[in-house]
Amino acid sequence: AAARRLGAFALVVEPHAVDAEDARTALARAGFALFPLDVQPRRTIVVSLTGAEEDILARMKQKTRYNVRLAQKKGVTVRRGDERDAELYYSLMHATAVRDGFSIHPAAYYRDFLRLFTGGNGTGALFLAEAAGRPLAALIATAVGREAVYLYGASADDGRELMPTYLLQWEAMRWARAHGCDRYDLWGVPDEDEDTLEAGFESRHDGLWGVYRFKRGFGGALVRSVGAWVRPLSLPRWWAYRTALRRTGRHGLAA
């Protein structure tokens, strides 16, 4: 109803649900069909936060566990930030985008995001890793119910040998546990099965392959979501949209 009031001709949703028959059936019964374009990555790694902290560390790969402790040994500290750190966060995000070749939102987006998610009744937290007064890396996570999700990460060009991103993830997991979460979603890896991922992560660096190499070390399990689904609200306009996409050669969206 809200989508119709806004003049939308179709509603696209990406439910936070595992790719299973019951989820697909429920969506189909509600009038949705599978949409060929996913906005968010369908596959992710979810880390169990059950047990003691030493149990969580023990489930990590040896190198990842070592890097967490190395960062601590090298004097890296992690503090909570807020919207007052928006400019600092954006500078780290910009450095990461330039280094890794991807696009980011304008600075105002992150400023508003931090204000809404980390202030007042927000469900999120900003973590900043520093050493000797230098900002090295940052992470934004959110916690809802029993699950926390890693949303954004950024790092400076220097100081990467101190492994600040490993300690950031660990501190975010500790924060999530303190907020009653028993799982931590690392949010986004290539949409491939585990055998393919393990066979290719050392040689591939395109897309999400680079982050898979980092995320796999935290000892989580691969999970695939049900993906994007669409419900046309105005069939004439929906068919016109599909026809226009076909004419422009964007067949994936017109399927």
Please describe what each predicted stretch is.
Residues 1-8, 167-183, 188-191:
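Conserved acyl-CoA
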Residues 7-15:
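Divalent metal-dependent hydrolysis catalytic cores, especially in the metallo-beta-lactamase
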Residues 8, 65, 76, 220-223:
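Generic structural signal for secondary-structure transition and capping sites
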Residues 15-162, 170, 174-178:
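A conserved beta-strand-loop-helix scaffold within acyl/acetyltransferase catalytic domains
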Residues 30-54, 186-255:
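Active-site/acyl-donor-binding loops of N-acyltransferases
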Residues 87, 166-170, 209, 213:
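A structural signal for well-ordered alpha-helical segments within the folded catalytic domains
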